[in-house]
Structure formats: structure tokens, C-alpha cells
Amino acid sequence: MKRIEAYTDGACSGNPGPGGWGALLRWNGNEKELKGGEAETTNNRMELMAAISALSALKEPCEVDLYTDSVYVRDGISGWIEGWKRNGWKTAAKKPVKNAELWQALDEARKAHKVTWHWIKGHAGHPENERADELARAGMEPFKYAGHRTLKVK
């Protein structure tokens, strides 16, 4: 199985407001950068989109070390999601899970792979995380002055 390092980040101006996501994939000395954004979104949605996009870009089953600076993504995928699925996508307080469609997409995207989730402190000088942040901000840029639409930028 191919081993991949994925560094993901999301950004949002306004929260809600225009947002972007970025991902840096590394394997065997190769790199691939991904980015995209939306006109009206939240930082948590963009963090999820970054992870979904990174895993969905892989064309074959891989061993993935996925690095995120989002405690929301790390805690959700490493713990909360199993309870949400058991509870019909409701929280322990019986409220609908926020961003359920994205959590479901992330759950689906990870199935083909062996993913190890890592949390890293954001904006702490970690070069790959800083690059993912730059990609997320670049993915947001077209939406800062645009109408409500979605654009995937490669």
C-alpha cells in the first residue's frame, strides 16, 4: 500500500463568509496541492472539505497520515462520529449533527484507506501546515468579492 502524508487546512473570512480549503499530499518525493472554496461557509466546513478532498484525490487504497490543525475534525473523526452514526446523526443531546453531510462524506472518503489522524498546532511554523493554510487562503480568494457559488481550483 502506498504511504501518503496529507496536510489539510481550512480558512474563512467572517465565519460565516467566504472560505477556502487547502491540502498538500506527499508521497515518494512527489507533491500534489489541492485547493477550493465557497462564497458562504464556515471554518469548520472548510476544515472538513480539506480532509475530504485530500482523501478523495487518492486513486488507490493508501496508508495515510493526515495532519490537521482542527480539533473539531480530529475529535469528530476519532470519536464522535461512531456515536453520531449509532444515533441517526444526532448528538448526545439529540440535536442534529452540524455539517452531517460533510461528516458522512469524510466517513465515506476514508473507507478505502488506512488513515491515521494527527493534530498539529496551527500557525506554529510547521512548514507543511503553513503551506496548507496558504492553499486554503488562495482557495478562498475568488470568493471574497464573488456571488454565491462554488468553485474548485486545481
From Swiss-Prot:
Mg(2+) 1 binds at D9, E47, D69. It holds the Pfam family RNase_H. It is an enzyme of class 3 (hydrolase). Keywords: Cytoplasm, Endonuclease, Hydrolase, Magnesium, Metal-binding, Nuclease. One of its GO terms (molecular function) is nucleic acid binding. It is found in: Cytoplasm. InterPro entries: RNase_H, RNaseH-like_sf, RNaseH_domain, RNaseH_sf, RNaseHI. GO terms for biological process: DNA replication, removal of RNA primer. Its EC number is 3.1.26.4. GO terms for cellular component: cytoplasm. It catalyses: Endonucleolytic cleavage to 5'-phosphomonoester. Its main location: cytoplasm. Residues 1-141 form the RNase H type-1 domain. Mg(2+) 2 binds at D9, D133. HAMAP family: RNase_H. Monomer. This is Ribonuclease H. The gene is rnhA.
